[in-house]
C-alpha cells in the first residue's frame, strides 16, 4: 500500500475546484461539507481543501485542520472511488474535537445518503 500524499492526489487549479462545485453533489455534517464529482478520468481520487479565515482566524489553526483532513485522506485513499473531492470546513475544530471531524469525514466519504449519513445539500 502506498501511504504517500503526492501531487497527483491534490486538486491544485481553480478549474478543478470549479468542476467539482458544478456537479452540486454535496453532503454536510456539523463540522465538514464534502463536494464530489462523478469521476475524474484517473485511476485514483483527488482532494481539495477549503478552510476560510471566517472559520479560523489564525493560520496555525487552519493549517491544523487541513493537516488532519489530509492525513485521513492519505490513510484512506485506497478505499475511495476515483473521484474528485472538495472538503470545506464549516466549523472550527481543534485537538479535542479532531476525532469527531475524522468520524464525520468517514461518514461523508463512505456513508450512503439513503441511510442518513450526512444530509444532501
UniProtKB/Swiss-Prot annotation:
It comes from the Bacteria. InterPro entries: Ribosomal_Su5_D2-typ_SF, Ribsml_uS5_D2-typ_fold_subgr, RNase_P, RNase_P_CS. Keywords: Endonuclease, Hydrolase, Nuclease, RNA-binding, tRNA processing. GO terms for cellular component: ribonuclease P complex. The keyword Lipoprotein does not apply. One of its GO terms (molecular function) is ribonuclease P activity. HAMAP family: RNase_P. This is Ribonuclease P protein component. The gene is rnpA.
Amino acid at each position: 500500500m502506498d501511504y504517500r500524499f503526492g501531487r497527483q492526489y491534490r486538486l491544485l487549479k481553480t478549474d478543478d475546484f470549479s468542476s467539482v462545485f458544478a456537479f452540486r453533489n454535496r453532503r454536510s455534517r456539523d463540522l465538514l461539507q464534502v463536494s464530489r464529482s462523478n469521476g475524474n478520468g484517473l485511476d485514483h481520487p483527488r482532494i481539495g481543501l477549503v478552510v476560510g479565515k471566517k472559520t479560523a482566524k489564525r493560520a496555525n489553526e487552519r493549517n491544523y485542520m487541513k493537516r488532519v483532513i489530509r492525513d485521513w485522506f492519505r490513510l484512506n485513499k485506497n478505499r475511495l472511488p476515483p473521484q474528485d473531492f472538495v472538503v470545506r470546513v464549516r466549523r472550527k475544530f481543534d485537538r479535542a474535537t479532531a476525532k469527531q471531524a475524522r468520524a464525520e469525514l468517514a461518514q461523508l466519504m463512505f456513508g450512503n445518503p439513503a441511510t442518513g449519513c450526512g444530509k444532501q445539500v
